[in-house]
Amino acid sequence: MNLKNRHFLKLLDFTPEEITAYLDLAAELKAAKKAGREIQRMKGKNIALIFEKTSTRTRCAFEVAARDQGAGVTYLEPSASQIGHKESIKDTARVLGRMYDGIEYRGFAQETVEELTKYAGVPVFNGLTNEFHPTQMLADALTMREHSGKPLNQTAFAYVGDARYNMGNSLLILGAKLGMDVRIGAPQSLWPSEGIIAAAHAAAKETGAKITLTENAHEAVKNVDFIHTDVWVSMGEPKEVWQERIDLLKDYRVTPELMAASGNPQVKFMHCLPAFHNRETKVGEWIYETFGLNGVEVTEEVFESPASIVFDQAENRMHTIKAVMVAALGD
């Protein structure tokens, strides 16, 4: 499978076989790192990390993955980057493309990362946009593969909550591309766009995936192997939307009762993080004082239970991001 010099922007750009090749490479690289026998395949390479949105996991994953493989990284933080402010995306791409072997972008519009690819002349990796989160999808798929005990095309998962943005969009496409049984449980007003749903159905025709969108959370999770969720209010949204979102999504909160509704005693909980699962953050305490909720999209009981595999999932961000870079740039 030749993934050399490929951009990594969204899963819709890849065949099921190519996505599986990334997962296989990630598993191989993970095993090599754990065994202390990792071979550096990116010596002398340099990666630019453009962050218009802050991040813990994505930044750390790219930096550790690159350094493990012998590559250098430059982190361009939100306050330091001139992209789109004093310098156009087109010009930024052409400058960085002369200095770096690859560029990671984490920001807002998908159009921005797509434009970078047109002018950079080097592989561009999408660390997150409003529309898609493809590196997270590889981590999620690898984590499900590790914990499922069966092939992904025999695995079922549900995403419950606000499904309009990058996680809902991307998980729907992931399941469709890999022939999985994928369900979205959300109010219809918070479903992915018609275009995303149509793309998922088109992919499912090729792979045999089963796609379900429902407003009934219990129906969504019935007989699944994994239950995913994400925060109910996204980065940059005003505090005023919290009450509206809580009213809309209270029935989609991942509680022990919702986990039990799967009917699967081995069901696992997944979350891309950060999660509002208790009062131990400033935002979590504010939510508790304002709305009386100790934990929002997931309860502390579920988050800290043996069913929670969120930290395996977080670790796999690094191994899968490493696979993307090695596939594109490795010797």
Swiss-Prot record:
Carbamoyl phosphate binds at S55, T56, R57, T58, Q82, R106, H133, P134, T135, Q136, C272, L273, R317. One of its GO terms (biological process) is citrulline biosynthetic process. It is found in: Cytoplasm. GO terms for cellular component: cytoplasm. InterPro entries: Asp/Orn_carbamoyltranf_P-bd (IPR006132), Asp/Orn_carbamoylTrfase (IPR006130), Asp/Orn_carbamoylTrfase_sf (IPR036901), Asp_carbamoyltransf_Asp/Orn-bd (IPR006131), Orn/put_carbamltrans (IPR002292), OTCase_ArgI (IPR024904). Its EC number is 2.1.3.3. L-ornithine binds at N166, D230, S234, M235. Pathway: Amino-acid biosynthesis; L-arginine biosynthesis; L-arginine from L-ornithine and carbamoyl phosphate: step 1/3. It comes from the Bacteria. It catalyses: carbamoyl phosphate + L-ornithine = L-citrulline + phosphate + H(+). The keyword Transferase applies. One of its GO terms (molecular function) is ornithine carbamoyltransferase activity. Transmembrane segments: none annotated. Keywords: Amino-acid biosynthesis, Arginine biosynthesis, Cytoplasm, Transferase. The keyword Plastid does not apply. SUPFAM superfamilies: Aspartate/ornithine carbamoyltransferase (SSF53671). Belongs to the aspartate/ornithine carbamoyltransferase superfamily. OTCase family. Reversibly catalyzes the transfer of the carbamoyl group from carbamoyl phosphate (CP) to the N(epsilon) atom of ornithine (ORN) to produce L-citrulline. PANTHER family: ORNITHINE CARBAMOYLTRANSFERASE, ORNITHINE CARBAMOYLTRANSFERASE, MITOCHONDRIAL. This is Ornithine carbamoyltransferase. It comes from Neisseria meningitidis serogroup C / serotype 2a (strain ATCC 700532 / DSM 15464 / FAM18).
